[in-house]
């Protein structure tokens, strides 16, 4: 059976932690099914700050959230889960070493690691054993529908409602 969820996303890049937490609370109170928070900064200090923000968010909301973050080493993934995140989203075009991604999938499960891709690439041909792709910048046309069917995975479409 097909179903839809409302999963707002919050870009934590260059944003005050208090603003991210407040926005997460507002989405939670407004009836969101889950949240997707991300900060793909490659700067270590900014990633650590984002992890602290995720911990604050986890204390304030009662819905699951996914966290997107630049992964440099396996410990980064463990840190994300320690914040209370239900799933990790890895941006495919930032992956330097697919063996890290494969290790994360083997350790945490294919249902806990999502891969974020642009709709214009052939995501259906990515040889990773994940259950879900998060696809951004989507124009739903016949070619996109064919890719979705060939991928044989769950697809979350990340798009602005505005």
Task: Name each model-derived stretch.
Residues 104-105:
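Extended substrate/RNA-proximal surfaces in nucleic-acid metabolism proteins
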């Amino acid at each position: 059976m097909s179903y839809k969820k409302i999963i707002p996303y919050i870009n934590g890049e260059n944003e005050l932690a208090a603003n991210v937490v407040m926005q997460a609370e507002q989405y939670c109170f407004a009836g969101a099914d889950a949240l997707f928070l991300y900060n793909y900064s490659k700067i270590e200090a900014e990633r650590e700050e984002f992890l602290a923000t995720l911990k604050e968010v986890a204390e304030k909301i009662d819905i699951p959230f996914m966290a997107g973050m630049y992964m440099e080493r396996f410990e980064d993934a463990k840190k994300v889960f320690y914040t209370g995140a239900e799933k990790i989203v890895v941006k495919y075009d930032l992956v330097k070493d697919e063996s890290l991604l494969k290790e994360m999938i083997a350790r945490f499960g294919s249902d806990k690691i999502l891969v974020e891709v642009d709709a214009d690439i052939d995501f259906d041909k990515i040889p990773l054993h994940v259950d879900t792709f998060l696809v951004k910048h989507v124009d739903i046309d016949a070619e996109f529908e064919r890719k979705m069917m060939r991928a044989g995975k769950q697809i979350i479409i990340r798009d602005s409602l505005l």
